[in-house]
Curated annotation (Swiss-Prot):
Keywords: Coiled coil, mRNA transport, Nucleus, Ribosome biogenesis, Transport. This is 60S ribosomal subunit assembly/export protein LOC1. Residues 148-167, 184-195 have a biased composition (Basic and acidic residues). InterPro entries: Loc1 (IPR037650). Belongs to the LOC1 family. GO terms for cellular component: nucleolus; preribosome, large subunit precursor. Component of the 66S pre-ribosomal particle. It is found in: Nucleus, Nucleolus. The gene is LOC1. GO terms for biological process: intracellular mRNA localization; mRNA transport; ribosomal large subunit biogenesis. It comes from Scheffersomyces stipitis (strain ATCC 58785 / CBS 6054 / NBRC 10063 / NRRL Y-11545) (Yeast). Residues 121-178 form a coiled coil.
Amino acid sequence: MAPRQSKTAKRSKTQNKTRANESEVFSDASARNLMANQPKLTEKSKVKKLSKRVVKKQQAKIRLYGAKNGKEYREDQLDIPTLNKAIIPGVRAKKGKKGKKFVDDNDTLTLSRLVKSINDKYDVVNESKLEKSRRLEELRELKKKEIERKEQQKMDKLEGKKSELKNRASVARSNRRKNAKAAKKIEDEETDQPRKKTKSVSFA
């Protein structure tokens, strides 16, 4: 025969069976009112959702003719903020293409050297040693002349700068002399003017 259950055991057994977790919204009236008055936090989408029929049509068009590319925007149209760059003092950033050197139209020396050096690749095919040495000698001469011209340009620039500084110094010197002469003239005029006689009183 099974042992007899106590009343407390029976009560706990029945309680465990019927226990349920009920939400406060259903049990508490004030909580229910709070939920009812709560505004919609998520904004309603401004873009209208397409119907299934329209979407199907669009998909069919894409399959037939391909998808259209969206509008391409330039960088200045996108309003991208420009970042602050660190400026290194005394270093000027080079502009333009890297390693690009422009040749003047009247610079026949450089142009002829370039033409000769470019034609090298095609002349090598059938030329004698004598022709090759002559061509290389011409190239060397042209390069030498170019270097001499560059040196001359540097010297001219230096001389020009020197003369400019000398002229500036001489102009400053002449200005100083003029100012000194003018000041001396004013002083002389002031001394030449007769001073007014002042009455002197003597006490015996």
